[in-house]
Swiss-Prot record:
Positions annotated to bind Zn(2+): H15, H26, H28
Descriptive protein name: Dihydroneopterin monophosphate aldolase
Catalytic activity, as annotated: 7,8-dihydroneopterin 3'-phosphate = glycolaldehyde phosphate + 6-hydroxymethyl-7,8-dihydropterin
Cofactor: binding details: Binds 1 zinc ion per subunit.
Length: 114
């Protein structure tokens, strides 16, 4: 039987994005929710603490940073894709990233699904 487990994290970072023109550099508290799926083996999908370590390791790269120095045009969508690529590389082979939600403050967010 498959199950999904969920981990939430947050980080503070600054960015400037280009929609039609470049915005001014500004900051947000980003909220992240990661959902992974796998078979229940020995009573669990993946040790919660291992999932926390994977996600927190990625979040640490972004926390209190200027995201424009890490990626081009750090829109919330691009930040979510960047995070997802790094999480996927560090999950056990039998556990898959199914959903990632990233909120920019309390009003706007993006959700990726696989």
């Amino acid at each position: 039987m498959k199950a999904r487990i969920i981990y939430r994290a947050s980080f503070d970072a600054a960015h400037a994005v280009k929609i039609e023109e470049w915005e001014e550099l500004h900051g947000h508290t980003f909220s992240l929710e990661v959902v992974v799926e796998g078979e229940i083996k020995k009573g669990y999908v993946m040790d919660f603490l291992k999932l926390k370590k994977v996600v927190d390791g990625v979040v640490k790269e972004l926390d209190h940073r200027n995201l424009n120095k890490i990626m081009d045009n750090p829109t919330t969508e691009n930040i979510a894709l960047w995070i997802s690529e790094r999480i996927r590389k560090n999950l056990p082979g039998d556990v898959k990233l199914k959903r990632l939600s990233l909120w920019e403050g309390n009003e706007f967010g993006v959700e990726l699904e696989w």
